[in-house]
Amino acid sequence: MTPSASPSPSPNPGDANVKVDADSPNDFILFSHELPSGDIQDLIRRLHRYGTLPGYPHLARFLQECALLLRTEIQKLPRALRDSVPPFHDVVTLASHWDRLKSGPLSGAWDGPFLCLYEIAMLIGHHETHQLSYRRPACLVGISVGLFSAAAVAVSKSISDLVSYGAESVRTAFAFCVHVQRVSQELEPTMTEQAASVSWATVVIGVPADTIQVELDRFNHLKESESPGANARPLTGVSISHVDQTSVGVTGPPSRLKQLFRQSELLRSSRHSALPISGGLCHVPNVYDDEDVRAILEMAEVWEKWGTRALQVPLISPFTGSPFLCPDAYHLIEAICTEALTKQLYFDKLAGGVVTQLNGLSCQVLHYGASLMSDTIIDDVTSQLSPCDTARQCLVDWALRDAFDQLPGGPTPPRDAKLAVVGMACRMPGGADTPDHFWELLMNGVDTHTTVPPDRFDLDAHFDPSGEKENTTTKGSQSNRPLSRQAEQTDPMQRLALVTAYEALEMAGFVPNRTPSSHLSRVGTYYGQASDDYREVNAGQKIGTYGIPGTERGFGNGRINYFFNFQGPSFNIDTACSSGLAAVQAACSALWAGEADTVVAGGLNVITSPDIYCMLSKGHFLSKTGQCKVWDIGADGYCRADGIGSVVIKRLDDALADNDVILACISAGATNHSAESISITQPHAAAQRENYRQVMDRAGVSPLDVSFVELHGTGTQVGDAVESESVLSFFAPLGRRSHPDKRLHLGAVKSNIGHGEAAAGIASLIKVLLMYRNNTIPRHIGIRTAMNPVVAQHLANRNAGILSENHPWLAATASKKRYAIVNSFGAHGGNTTLLLEDAPSQHSQRYKNHSRRVVASSEVVCTSAKSKASLRANIRALLAYLDTHQETDLRDLAYTTSARRMHHHIRIASSVTSTAQLRSFLQAAADDVDAYAKHIATATKRTAVFAFSGQGCLYHGAAAHLFEQAPLFRNQVLQLDRIVRRLGFPSILVTVAGDAASVYDSARCPHRESTPSSDASHDSNTNRTSTAPAVDSPLIAQLALVVIQIALVQYWGLLGIKPSVVIGHSLGEYAALVAASVLSVADALFLVGKRAELMLAVCEPGSHAMLSVRGASVDRIEELCRESEKRYPFEVSCVNGLTDLVVTGLRGDMASLRDLLQGSGLKCVLLDIPFAFHSKQMSPILEDFENAAQQITFQEPAVPVISPLLGKCISEANVINGKYLARATREPVDFVAALDSAWADGTVNDKSIWIDIGPHPVCTSFASNHYGKAATQSFASLRRGDETLSTLTATLAALHCLGLPVDWNEYYDLRENPARLLHLDSYQWNYKNYWIPYEGSWTLDKAHAGQNNKTKDDNSAVTPAFFTSSVQQIIFEEYDESMGRMEALSDLHHPDLQGAADGHKIHGRSVVTGSIWADITLTVGEYLYKQMVPGGKMPHMNVKGMEVLEAQVLHPDMSQFIQIEGVLDLPRQQTAVRLYAASANGTRNTDKPFASATVCYEEAQDWQDQWQMTSHLVAARANSFWEMAAGGSDDNARPAGKGGPRVNNFFRSIAYQLFANVVDYGARYRGMQRVALSEDTLEATADIVLDKDRHGTWHTPPHWIDSAFQLAGFVMNSFGVQGDGKISGSSRDFFYITPGWRHFRLLERLEPGPEATYRSFVRMFPVGSEPGAYSGDIYLHRGKRLVGVCAGIKFKAVPRALMPVLFPRIEPQAGKRRNQAQTAENRLVKGKGNCEYTHTVFQEPKSRTPAYDVTKSQPHAEHCDISISQKTQPVAAVPVTQPALPAKERGEQNQGQSQSQNAQATACLSLISDETGLDLDDLTGEAAFADLGVDSLMSLALSAKIRAELGIDVQSSIFLECPTVQDLVTWLSK
């Protein structure tokens, strides 16, 4: 609401200038503009601590209101900005993240609100500390943002007013700062830098303001002749922001400030320093206007919150030096925003303004501590008031005292917020697997009790009616049914807790991090559990891997938190029979205390143990006759029952804000104890009444207003009597409920389903929630014969009773709510009570009374699952819902299935316009799930390519429908239009939005009252309608296209889709550069507008034309022209495809050429464009355009830019500049070359997703035509003629199914067009049976078990554990305080280690490469350090002094073992590692090591400091090699230039063919993709991609190390260096081997695959002291970063004649290894699972990628498709379609697939299926093991089984190395 839309306050200038008389206070308050120096977090902590003390109630309330308002304002921000703010519930928590806030995308928005919070809080605390009455000062002074604090004081009459308006000033300051930062970032993005350190202002000392202004005018080019048609003062200009006696402040974009002080000799030589202003531009006349002020006022709701409040105290303007002349608070805030945005600060004027408001002989200055600016102003006031005495009072001193010696005034009372129950789920007896089924059971009066099922235990064996048999029960009834099964080692209670939690969250529409209350760090779990039957009886018989996490109580909650990634509290609570409701009450307390924002709570009970029956029977708890007979005369105890229930609860305000469906509200809750009962198990009426009183008093509700009480109602004589007394005496006292409408109804669900013990309370709560939903009270079936006379006596004359028939429960009205009580009492004496009430009436009516905008639009409906079976069932459930709810609104359904669902990795989605169309789609999908389902693989990453079309796709109103229907997009367009107009160009709104623009164009400049605060001289050139060109002018058209494209980029970003790569065609490249952060928004629009103006000024419209030609190449066109024997002068402007061209020339020539080509059967179109772009017509504007672009700042691309001008991908800075844009204007657009380059270098591939950014898809069609439709997946944003936005919704549906993270919550703007959350059917689980049955009757005689068992004496040795592939067995360890020592034994013929050696052959023999010794050294170094410093930060390791004295050559006919010794000297921070030849028993063959090295533990920063000087030099030298090698071939050297070295360029195959002259590398070692080598200088550089497979368990796989650093060996051995140091063409005389290196350092772990490309460089030098020896340093870069160095690597010459001697060839002979070797291998491989020690295995971190289909069960448990050990996280996408392959490649692929399906693979998959319970159908293709539930524990178990049963040597990391089924099958086939 704004003043123009509401009754405007009457201006009364006479009241605005508040006068003070002689008796008024003679003091003033100075509000600073900057936060105090020092620790802001400590200041806020101090304020928070004072706020907890009893003497500071106003301070406490102020801090609470600030937190609430900031949370509200943050929710208004786009998702990306919201997510950058950590969750907080109070300001101290928010302030604790200060460093994170100041480095995030809102870095500049926090100083302002925290300044206001600080200033107001200090002022309030000052009054409360000194117990001062609130006294208004004579006047106020504020500077910049400090004016908002001053405004709060200016309108406050009391300290209470100051609390309210102070909090509003914080809100307004936040809105102001957010707006300033957003606008400033559009002028120059600084978020890519360390934002907090970027300064937008500089102070210059000692130079007059007039002199500085002259310099600024010169710098800003303020000569109209230099900027024809453009704004005289560019948005990015530098201007003066403040002036005082000694200094002048200048402000502007950071890069422009740097240029200013570089170019201006005057300013460069002056005294100047940067100001700590990181938020953006303020006090500038050239950037903001009234629209900005209005936007801030609307965002902060200033009219609604400040309104017509009168000013109480004059506030001095720092611009005029006089009081603001404003009639009310609204206009005061408006004036402050205007001044803070657009007016300069004149501090010299402030003193005079203050003096005019003061009188008397003394005055007091209240200030916020010393600062240069404050001291200057106060000194000026003091000097002008002389001889008046001026006293100073610091408002901060009170908070800086360290003495918090005041005692708190008791505990802080619970917050009075009501809570909302928004979700529920259950598994109850009688088949009640859903709340709806549970309700049917209650309405039908079903008694569910039955005998104990045989799968629990043998009832005949454990039942003894006499009660005399030991460990038997006399009661055998149980009220349950076999529920669902799952993984047998996990307690069914834990499985069902997870299942029902999921279903309750699904009903609640919970999506992680969707809103503040759903932030994962603010969600907790609370469950009640009172027994461990399954652990004690069932799982204890078959203890396995999951024994502990599957059965210990804490894991029940922990598994839910882990699965969903909840980071809030997790409590498992046992209060006997009341555990479930006590857990709910504890969860409510957490919400009231602010410990969580959302809680999942419930109760768990699954009965499997006969022992508990026995105990309860012996204790006389159980009924001998069946079901609980609550209040029946024959009540004799209770019937035990299974039960699981979960509810989701939030604070009511959060639920309303989150658009949740509220089932009911919880007003209050309490738990107490019956301490005065005569027996611990006997209830106590007085304690129960006290419990009720606590609840009702806390809620402030009369007991007489309660209309229903759900009793605990166990059905015992004592319990029924006591509870009836306590309930009726409190809620229905005699004579008090006389009115018929006040009747109290009673009920007890135990009469239907029995006593669920720990689940009893949650069952009662769910029953009452269902009553609220269905407006009915179910009948009570507990009285089977007659009522208990004691109960009847209590009921008499109280207008209370029990219903024997279902009874309507009238829904709440505006004047009357329904209140209900839920009781639950524990046998241990605990009493828990909750008070429930109706959801707010305005909530239930909000949609009925809201008239939606009637817009025909498409909607996206989607569903997903963890398995195809569940997906099919989910689809059918959705169809069934549509059948039974034919009135369903399509938007509600779309909103529910997209924005309010957690999405799984098997998905379907469709864009539809009607429910009939949806029904058709769903039916087809249900009939053929395989055809419709899209599988999202966690292991595949997708690239999103944004393609920006050129001007030819624009048409009038191109984005009209999206503008009208999508507020997010509309807001972007309106903001961009404002920038266009501020740049001096005409509005583009009509061109973009068509007729819809008129509504918003008129709203942009509404009639506003003129007030004294308005400055008539404020320049504004935003309204140029009188001189604006026609809508279809080239200027408007070009600006409009770029505005649409930029707005689409921003819109897609808000929806969660951001580009990985961008490509722009012609004009579209400007928007592409904005998307890549090369250009700011303002700069891009300036350049586009400037270019268009130059065209209009210089070029003649219509003189030239552009002709689109399809179906012919350039050669064909030229051929046709020659054949015609006529001259058709043309030039090629665009190469869109091999036969899709645009040619240009004079219009007449193009018309003739068109006729010629059409006559030859070609399709030609003359484009309706006034200019011929990319032709010689553009030449006259190039120089002026390039000059205009020189003032623009070009940033380094944030994502690769595919350049159609250069035909390559650009990732580095300084390539795109003004010259580039000038060339792009004139030179042709070669889209084909750009596409080819992007594919060749891997920037795009067949998995890339192409999104066309423009009014109509053009560029994506170019890509599809060029690559082939099978190799591209392209989608459009808009399409001409699409009025329902079906193009956009279809794209959203497709992107969702491809796994891109669509933010559906942002897509739905509920403020403008609300949607309702529907309660659809819950997830359809794919149940499978898993259950460990209780065998026999061993519990009957367990006390005597084992008396006859003989004790076994097992002295067999335990085989040491397998450690890694290179350090296989640790056979000895010892440690003391400073030293650690270990010995390990490894078999060189172990498959992993032998495989590594086999990849490095010399003369046909496998030789252990030095990279294996490096891995061993790193492994030992890390292991010892972690053992000696457990939990400490692992430093980086430098492998120094590697010396290999003897090569290890593998012999196939003998065993070969090595012993590894490591000795850690902790004080010296180093580990000595020595390697010895050894026997199979670990004995060394010799005391002389064959290799040794030292690991030194060092700091990475020291390395980086050392490398800083050389890194860029090395990189530059390597780059120059590639430039010199350009144009060469594999076998032809190219001269590098005059006097330069000859450089040869080799690709992978040739390089390793040359290498094979000495070393024959296996495939895994062939990481060098290409090499550039100079024989002259022994230099080389190589581009490297590491093999994706680790091939074992390693610290750093040897084939990775070798690939990264083998370049030196290539230099020495590829051509050969002779013994005299000369180089020859081959290695015929010598070959070179390396004995080691000086040091080896890796800054980071190596990463495999094309995503991590490395570049190495080396230069080898002769070692003067060693003839035939060479040494060099190998440098390894990843991108621009130096990540590794192997320094001093040495190679020694060996005569080639010795090669057959050193490495004699041996023909392979099978089966020659001796028995000793076989025994040792068995010991090392087969004995891995039987380990005595536990060691950390060095391998990649275990993936925690989710699989939603968590295994969930109900008792007797079914297994559904949720993996219990996984958590939910986003997943990456896989391609929907695979690219077509040539026939030969298809044949090879099919052959490979055929070979992979061998018996070994089949057996392995069958074993995995057996062990996991997965169907073989699930183990196909791209199915990811992580998604299927294979976690770290399961990986260990499966790998052990595969080794033991199939004899396949696999490590537990196999499922990380082969993340999908296809990966594993491929690996097995190898």
Swiss-Prot record:
Its cofactor is pantetheine 4'-phosphate. Residues 416-838 form the Ketosynthase family 3 (KS3) domain. Residues 1795-1870 form the Carrier domain. It comes from the Eukaryota. GO terms for molecular function: 3-oxoacyl-[acyl-carrier-protein] synthase activity; fatty acid synthase activity; phosphopantetheine binding. Residues 40-279 are annotated as: N-terminal acylcarrier protein transacylase domain (SAT). It is an enzyme of class 2 (transferase). Residues 947-1282 are annotated as: Malonyl-CoA:ACP transacylase (MAT) domain. Transmembrane segments: none annotated. Binds 1 phosphopantetheine covalently. Residues 453-492, 1004-1027 are annotated as: Disordered. Residues 1364-1704 are annotated as: Product template (PT) domain. Residues 1368-1502 are annotated as: N-terminal hotdog fold. Residues 1538-1700 are annotated as: C-terminal hotdog fold. Pathway: Secondary metabolite biosynthesis. Keywords: Acyltransferase, Multifunctional enzyme, Phosphopantetheine, Phosphoprotein, Transferase. One of its GO terms (biological process) is secondary metabolite biosynthetic process. The active site is at residues 577, 712, 755, 1400, 1602. Residues 1368-1700 form the PKS/mFAS DH domain. It catalyses: holo-[ACP] + 6 malonyl-CoA + acetyl-CoA + 6 H(+) = 3,5,7,9,11,13-hexaoxotetradecanoyl-[ACP] + 6 CO2 + 7 CoA; holo-[ACP] + 5 malonyl-CoA + acetyl-CoA + 5 H(+) = 3,5,7,9,11-pentaoxododecanoyl-[ACP] + 5 CO2 + 6 CoA. The modification O-(pantetheine 4'-phosphoryl)serine is found at residue 1832. Residues 455-472 have a biased composition (Basic and acidic residues). Multidomain protein; including a starter unit:ACP transacylase (SAT) that selects the starter unit; a ketosynthase (KS) that catalyzes repeated decarboxylative condensation to elongate the polyketide backbone; a malonyl-CoA:ACP transacylase (MAT) that selects and transfers the extender unit malonyl-CoA; a product template (PT) domain that controls the immediate cyclization regioselectivity of the reactive polyketide backbone; and an acyl-carrier protein (ACP) that serves as the tether of the growing and completed polyketide via its phosphopantetheinyl arm. Non-reducing polyketide synthase; part of the pkg gene cluster that mediates the biosynthesis of dihydrocitreoisocoumarin and 6,8-dihydroxy-3-(2-oxopropyl)-isocoumarin. The non-reducing polyketide synthase pkgA performs the condensation of one acetyl-CoA starter unit with 6 and 5 malonyl-CoA units, respectively. As pkgA lacks a releasing domain, the thioesterase pkgB is necessary to break the thioester bond and release dihydrocitreoisocoumarin and 6,8-dihydroxy-3-(2-oxopropyl)-isocoumarin from pkgA. NCBIfam families: PT_fungal_PKS (TIGR04532). This is Non-reducing polyketide synthase pkgA. The gene is pkgA.
